[in-house]
Structures are given as C-alpha cells and as structure tokens.
A protein has these predicted regions:
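C-terminal functional extensions of proteins
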Residues: 235, 243-278
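A short, acidic, amphipathic alpha-helical segment used as a generic capping/interface helix at domain edges
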Residues: 73-80, 193-208, 212, 224-238
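Periplasmic-binding protein-like
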Residues: 27, 86-93, 142-144, 211-220
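Conserved beta-alpha
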Residues: 113-114, 118-182
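N-terminal glycine-rich anion-binding loop in soluble enzyme alpha/beta folds
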Residues: 2-76, 157-192
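Glycine/small-residue-rich loop that forms an oxyanion/phosphate-binding "nest" at active or ligand-binding sites
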Residues: 78-125
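Short Gly/Thr/Asp-enriched flexible loops that form oxyanion-binding sites at enzyme active sites
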Residues: 99-114, 224-241
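Glycine-rich phosphate/diphosphate-binding loops that line cofactor/substrate pockets in enzymes
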Residues: 82-86, 130-140, 206-210
C-alpha cells in the first residue's frame, strides 16, 4: 500500500484546532511543585486551558547565580508554548528578573522580544509586579519579604526602586522576628502556619503606615485551607486588604492579573483589588 507523500501536520494552530479559546502556559521553578497553574485555572472561566513546564536543572539549589546561568531556558519555554498554540505565558519566580542583571528596561525588552518571536504574550512575575503597581497608581510600598533569603529580597527591593517606587520598608520573617535565622525559615519549605499571614502583614503595616500598598514577594504558602492545606497569597488577599485597608499585591496575583489582561478575560470570584480591577 502506497503511503501519502505528505504526512506533515499543519505548522500553525487555527482557532478551530485549539482545545480552549484561551490557552496559557506557566513555568515551574526548578526544585519546586508550583501552584500557579492550579490556582490560575481555578479562578479562570471554562474557556481557559492551562499547561505547565517544569524547568529542569538537576543540581538546582535556588542560587541567584543559577537563575542567571539558566535564564536562556525561558526562551526554550516560550518557543515550546508558542509552537503548541499558547496565547499567554507566565514565568513563575520573582527573583529571575533581578538575577538576570538586565535591569527593568532590559526585562521589559526581553519579554517584548519573546512575545514577538513566538506569537504570544510572555510575562515574568517580577516585571508583572512593576506593571501592576503602576496600573494601581502606587508610589510608596512596603515589601513583606516573607521566606526570601536576604540577597533575594534585597534584589527585589532594588529592582522596584529602579522602576521608580519608594520602598519604605522591606524585610523577611527573620527581620520580623518570627524565626531565629534563615535556616529555620528554609526548613518550612515555604509553607507556614495560617495565622502568620495576618501577624506578618500587621507587622509590616506598623513599620510603614504611609505605604500606598503592601506587597509580598515570591509564592508564599500559609496553612489556611481546609484541614490546613497550604494556600498562596491569592487566597489571603481579600482578608488582608480588609484588615489593612489598602491594596495587597503579591507576585502570584500580579502575574495572574497581567496574563488575564493579555487574554482580555476576567477572573471569576473576588480575589482582591488588583484582580477585580480587570
């Protein structure tokens, strides 16, 4: 039996060939099981489909230098997602922007270049925070650095200052007095008691009462879910905003906001001022 000469699949995805009208891809930082695809999908309408791509660095130990050395993997991620019909990509991991050494404008240009090359909207968590704060007309901020190591959160504070924001106060759980040292924080593997979310933000608010907004870096988890299941800042934000009377913006909610904006889609439910501004 003679086989057809052309067995190639079409190179472009038409709208009729996509499983979902709006298709999204997220990175997962090496040595992590990230909740972003799950959290995003849970608040998205049924027209949205989500995929994840775990960055694979076998010897990864969370070093900023490792992020810089492996920054090129984001190009592979964008190429993979673009080739498979993804409309918007989200890079999870707030430290990658400052670890890259590209600066604020360099990161913006990097995101624009990947977007243009691969026919999608490419967003990084660290730069999404800048865009979110600007959209909310925020000038003065206080950074709750939660579990972040000192060189991590200091890099984040510097990146935000370079972007033009006035960082009134910044510090992590050790600076706030909840843990004796960074090793004790690391032992928790970024999952903390549920009541620490409120206590920590109350502390930061007392340190910087003049802040226009309180921000939190990274993807911190608190045991506030059913039977103590860990939950991200997405779940904490409405309660914290009610308690503090000001916007609370995290790198997870900032990234989701930016991706929903690119998709021209609104999230379902109430998840804080930023996401409800869409």
């Amino acid at each position: 039996m003679k086989m057809p000469e052309n067995l190639e699949m079409p190179q472009e995805w038409t709208p009729e060939q996509k499983l979902f009208p709006h298709q999204v891809g997220f990175t997962c930082p090496p040595f992590d099981f990230d909740a972003a695809p799950t959290d995003f999908l849970r608040i998205a309408p049924p027209t949205v489909g989500v995929h994840g791509w775990m960055l694979h660095v076998p010897d990864y130990q969370h070093g900023l230098d490792q992020r810089k050395r492996n920054f090129g993997m984001l190009k592979d991620f964008a190429h993979c997602m673009g080739r498979n019909g993804v409309d918007a990509c989200g890079q999870v991991g707030s430290n990658w922007v400052h670890a890259s050494g590209l600066g604020v404008d360099g990161i913006r240009e990097f995101c624009e270049k990947l977007s243009d090359e691969h026919g999608l909207a490419f967003h990084m968590a660290g730069y999404a925070m800048v865009e979110a704060l600007r959209a909310m007309n925020v000038e003065k901020i206080a950074l709750n650095a939660v579990y972040h190591w000192p060189d991590w959160w200091q890099g984040t504070a510097g990146f935000l200052e370079e972007a033009g924001f006035d960082v009134l106060w910044a510090g992590n759980f050790v600076d706030q007095g909840w843990f004796a040292d960074q090793s004790a924080v690391n032992e928790q593997r970024w999952i903390f008691d549920g009541d620490l979310a409120d206590k920590s933000f109350q502390y930061v608010a007392e340190k910087a009462p003049a802040a226009d907004a309180y921000i939190v870096n990274g993807m911190c988890n608190f045991r506030t879910g059913q039977n103590g299941q860990p939950e991200r800042m997405l779940h904490q934000t409405p309660r914290l905003e009610t308690m503090l009377g000001k916007p609370v913006i995290a790198h997870d909610t900032a990234l989701y906001w930016r991706m929903f904006k690119s998709l021209s889609v609104k999230p379902q439910g109430r998840h804080g001022q930023l996401l409800e501004s869409l």
